[in-house]
Design a protein with these regions (language model features):
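Mid-chain, well-packed structural core segment of small domains
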Residues: 80-107, 111
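Non-catalytic interface/targeting segments
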Residues: 1-81, 87-88, 113-133
Length: 133
């Protein structure tokens, strides 16, 4: 499922971001570097598709899959594409992320966490909800 993008802002119409962004109740938008139903097992540099979840204190819902190559702009660097397509997310769960991309994501308001590496996505999201919401 791919969300529609607002022509003026480029934001997803399904957006329910967190912290300094417009919120929809107590929902946190989370990007996961892993396979659906699997584990947080993709390195930042090796991810091809991000799973996007809306997370609340009581449940989570997969709302979108974002493929980097499909969303990249012409001549856009890979890191820039990733930062842009995750800008509506408050958190990125990833197996490993280097200092430079972590800083770029933080500047865009995305907290990149590798503390859930190797964990199954379901339990990682539940633990994240307990910590953040």
């Amino acid at each position: 499922m791919q969300a529609m993008r607002d022509a003026d802002t480029g934001r997803s119409s399904m957006s329910s971001p967190f912290n300094n962004r417009e919120t929809s109740g107590d929902t946190l938008r989370v990007a996961v570097a892993g396979n659906e139903g699997g584990r947080v097992d993709k390195h930042f540099g090796a991810v091809e598709i991000f799973l996007i979840y809306d997370l609340s204190a009581v449940d989570h819902k997969l709302v979108e899959r974002r493929a980097i190559d499909q969303l990249a702009l012409p001549d856009e660097e890979r890191r820039a594409t990733i930062v842009r397509i995750l800008a509506d997310c408050g958190v990125l769960l990833v197996e490993k992320v280097g200092a430079a991309p972590k800083k770029l994501l933080a500047e865009a308001g995305v907290d990149a966490l590798d503390k859930f590496k190797g964990r199954d996505i379901e339990s990682a999201l539940k633990e994240l909800a307990a910590e953040y919401l």
